[in-house]
Amino acid sequence: MMTSKTDKNKVLILGIGNTLMGDEGIGVHVVNSLEKTALPDGVELLDGGTGSFLLLEPMQSADKVILIDATIDGAKAGSVRRLHPRYSKDYPKTLTAHDIGLKDLIDAFYLMGKTPEVTLFAVSIEDLQDLTTEMSPDLNKVVPKVAGLVLEEALAF
């Protein structure tokens, strides 16, 4: 789902993840929670699902891109890191099920020329879950916190 206010100083908030794999869908759940918030002009929400090259166009039309994604990095589930990745090598070593697709997408994004500012909120998960739409209690608790951090990042731009 895409919601847009204007094209002036456009900020794209892009949630990545598979909501059929529990905690792995954290990025999409954060975007869904932000849909209930009155967003400032120029802020757009996009459910990026498991990522694909179809996301290049909305990413390139933004002045700033804020990504929210899950990572299996050994940190406590629900830990949040704010990163400024430039290339796929700047991402956490172990992203989850869509690892290669998202990293390839970021590399292609920068190779195509227009490079808006990118911020990644990497949310640690414990493990991949098979076929469940429910997130763990730890991840459910962190959704409002991550949504707040993302909104703060968008407002600061």
What residue ranges belong to the model's regions?
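SAM-dependent methyltransferases
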Residues: 1-10, 152-157
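A generic local secondary-structure boundary/capping motif
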Residues: 2-3, 56, 108-110
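Nucleotide and nucleotide-moiety/phosphate-recognizing core
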Residues: 6-14, 21-78, 82-86
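Short hydrophobic segments within beta-strands
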Residues: 14-16, 121
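Conserved short-loop catalytic and cofactor-binding motifs
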Residues: 18, 43, 93, 134
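Conserved active-site and cofactor/substrate-binding residues in soluble primary-metabolism enzymes
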Residues: 25, 29, 50, 75, ...
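Helix-loop-strand module that forms the ligand-binding subsite of alpha/beta enzymes
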Residues: 67-118
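Phosphate-binding/catalytic loops
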Residues: 102-157
